[in-house]
């Protein structure tokens, strides 16, 4: 089954495709052969990139930051990339990592999938050769099962024009990125397995620290930012001792390792399940035999598993403990945080399933799920009418999927961290394509992943009837994001004031849309209720 990631929502660990569709189209890659070459020397050798057609950005694509994780390196932490002599062309995206075709709204411009996929890209202002500009490292989303840096909406050229160096990196996914067989733990020397995709991200950050000065970037001013699984990754990197000192600020767009959406399990549990998968689906539990199998055979077997079957775990190495404990004890990395989510992260179908979306069915659902707490739940998610029940079901699915986990992350960083925290909600209503409109009353305002094109200034990557207000919102978000990367404060001249997240100010939230402004948190009671439930922890 292929899904629209924009239409995804979750109830607990189960993700269900919503009913509406967003039309997407790829922007054709620019003909790099017709553009002026540019050069940079890294620790591994010299690179030849291209200058953008307006002369403002230097672009380097497909830079190897680790050795290809193939053969004996399959399911091992990333190893150093080989150096080269001469000049290496860096004009095309590296292959995306092994993945099944899952999300129809993902459009790629690379020659993957392939196990040989650990490549990154750099966009640097052309005037930055001798400067030390802020660096922003992007981590894509896709449920840890899909994604690539070659998606048109994640092109870093326009964002770089705001005076930052933008980096994006591929990382291993699905069974190739998060397989935690017990034999892997034994051979690791650390009793750790899985989380190879997250260790790839750490290795990319190490590459940035060693090499980004060659592109005009400041290795002492690095911000990581990501969306969905990329935002989950950011919350994990903030918690991980392996990433300490590699970045200085963090931006999370819709997601964190809190709550039940993508619950981290201990290695002992995931290892047992993964060994059984190998034995039953691939016919062997031997790591040597599994490494000898074709990648396509392993990928095909993983496609038969439930969604998010292979995902990060508590391995004792990348994550010494669960993230809640790490944050609660104040042991996370001391970085500033800007995080939030979109107004409509979920869809009511995640709650009703095949049942009619009525008030009666929503109340029955509340009684079944919450028992004695159903009355309290319905005060926060009312269902006096069918229309109100649909809205509450959509709110609850979005809260449990994305809003609550991200809120909990913000709260814990605010309570236990040592640096400022900023919170937002993306409210900008997407324009609809002329040949498609949802049913009346069912149009989401700002669905999951809708902010990506705005953040990157890449509205042109999708065939939608964009309005002048969309372009203004995009410019606003780029300014906020890059200001935060530059100074740790998103505010700047001419921008609506964004207050720091604080109990003294009503936990104010920056609502980002055509009339952006900060308001006190209107839904704090909902998140506190969810936080009080044992299943939310």
Enumerate the language-model features and the residues they cover.
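Extracellular structured ligand-interaction cores
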Residues: 44, 115-119, 134, 163, ...
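Surface-exposed helix-capping loop/turn segments at secondary-structure junctions
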Residues: 124-133, 212-221, 281-286, 412-422, ...
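Non-catalytic accessory segments of hydrolases
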Residues: 10, 23-195, 459, 464-477, ...
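Hydrophobic h-region of N-terminal signal peptides that target proteins for export
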Residues: 16-24
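Bacterial N-terminal signal peptides that target proteins for export
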Residues: 1-13
């Amino acid at each position: 089954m292929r899904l629209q990631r924009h239409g995804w929502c979750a109830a607990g660990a189960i993700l269900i495709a919503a009913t509406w569709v967003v039309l997407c189209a790829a922007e054709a890659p620019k003909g790099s052969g017709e553009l002026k070459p540019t050069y940079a020397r890294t620790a591994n050798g010299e690179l030849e990139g291209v200058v953008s057609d307006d002369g403002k950005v230097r672009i380097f694509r497909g830079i190897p930051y680790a050795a290809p994780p193939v053969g004996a390196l399959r399911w091992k932490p990333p190893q150093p990339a080989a150096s080269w002599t001469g000049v290496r062309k860096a004009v095309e995206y590296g292959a995306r990592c092994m993945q099944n075709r899952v999300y129809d709204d993902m459009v790629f411009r690379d020659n993957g999938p392939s196990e040989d996929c650990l490549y990154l890209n750099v966009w640097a202002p052309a005037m930055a050769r001798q400067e030390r500009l802020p660096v922003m490292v992007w981590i894509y989303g896709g449920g840890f099962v899909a994604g690539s840096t070659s998606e048109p909406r994640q092109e870093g050229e326009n964002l770089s024009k705001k005076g930052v160096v933008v980096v994006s990196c591929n990382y291993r996914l699905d069974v190739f990125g998060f397989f935690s067989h017990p034999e892997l733990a034994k051979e690791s020397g650390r009793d750790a397995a899985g989380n190879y995709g997250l260790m790839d991200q750490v290795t990319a950050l190490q590459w940035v620290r060693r090499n980004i000065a060659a592109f005009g970037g400041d290795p002492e001013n690095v911000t990581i930012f990501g969306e969905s699984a990329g935002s989950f990754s950011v919350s994990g990197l903030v918690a991980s001792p392996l990433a300490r000192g590699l970045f200085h600020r963090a931006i999370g767009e819709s997601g964190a390792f809190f709550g039940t959406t993508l619950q981290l399990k201990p290695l002992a549990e995931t290892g047992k399940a993964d060994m059984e998968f190998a034995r039953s689906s691939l016919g062997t539990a031997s790591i040597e035999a599994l490494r000898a199998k074709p990648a396509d055979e392993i990928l095909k077997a993983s496609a038969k598993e439930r969604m998010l079957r292979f995902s990060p775990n508590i391995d004792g190495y990348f994550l010494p403990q669960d993230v809640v404990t790490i944050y609660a004890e104040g042991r996370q990395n001391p970085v500033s945080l800007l995080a939030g989510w979109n107004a409509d992260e979920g869809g009511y179908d995640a709650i009703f399933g095949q049942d009619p979306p009525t008030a009666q069915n929503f109340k029955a659902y509340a009684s079944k799920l919450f028992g004695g707490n159903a009355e309290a739940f319905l005060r926060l998610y009312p269902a006096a009418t069918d229309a109100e029940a649909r809205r509450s079901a959509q709110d609850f699915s979005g809260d449990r999927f994305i809003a609550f986990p991200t809120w909990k992350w913000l709260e814990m960083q605010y309570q236990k961290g040592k640096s400022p925290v900023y919170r937002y909600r993306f409210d900008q209503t997407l324009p609809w394509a002329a040949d498609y409109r949802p049913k009346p009353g069912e149009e989401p305002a700002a669905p999951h992943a809708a902010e990506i094109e705005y953040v990157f200034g890449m509205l042109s990557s999708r065939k939608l009837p964009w309005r002048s207000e969309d372009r203004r919102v995009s410019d606003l978000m780029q300014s906020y994001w890059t200001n935060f990367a530059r100074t740790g404060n998103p505010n700047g001249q001419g921008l609506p004031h964004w207050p720091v997240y604080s109990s003294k100010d009503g936990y104010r939230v920056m609502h980002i849309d055509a009339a952006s402004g900060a308001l006190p948190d209107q839904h704090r009671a909902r998140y506190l209720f969810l936080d009080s439930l044992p299943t939310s922890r």
